């Protein structure tokens, strides 16, 4: 067995593999972003810039069902970036629909879940 470090710019607690063809490794930890490693790309390239991704948590506050331009505070017609308290916790990919679920606010902030 071989262990390899992968550079990331986000917390890497509680890893959970997804159910996709890329064998994506989803991570949770402190910080206001969802982070992942596309292990298929990592295995092929050993390039963290190509294999690692992240995105901030965003609420669909304008209610149109899609990701739009977003800001840090609610604003007419835009979605809103969300900081889940002490950070996301316990990431869990859904086995059939591809959504990614997190719990939030475990130690501080608003309790809830993110999808």
Regions found by a protein language model. Give the residues of each.
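Acidic, glycine-anchored loop motifs typical of Ca2+
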Residues: 1, 43-52, 60-80
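Structural motif
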Residues: 32-46, 108-115
């Amino acid at each position: 067995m071989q262990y390899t470090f992968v550079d990331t710019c986000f917390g890497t607690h509680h890893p959970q593999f997804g159910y996709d063809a890329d064998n994506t490794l989803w991570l949770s930890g402190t910080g206001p972003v969802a982070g992942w490693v596309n292990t298929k790309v990592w295995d092929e390239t050993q390039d963290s810039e190509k294999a690692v991704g992240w995105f901030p948590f965003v609420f669909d506050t304008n209610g149109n069902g899609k990701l739009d331009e977003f800001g840090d505070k609610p604003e007419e017609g835009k979605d809103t970036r969300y900081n889940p308290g002490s950070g996301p916790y316990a990431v869990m990919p859904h086995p059939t629909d591809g959504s990614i679920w997190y719990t939030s606010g475990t130690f501080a902030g608003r309790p809830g879940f993110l999808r």
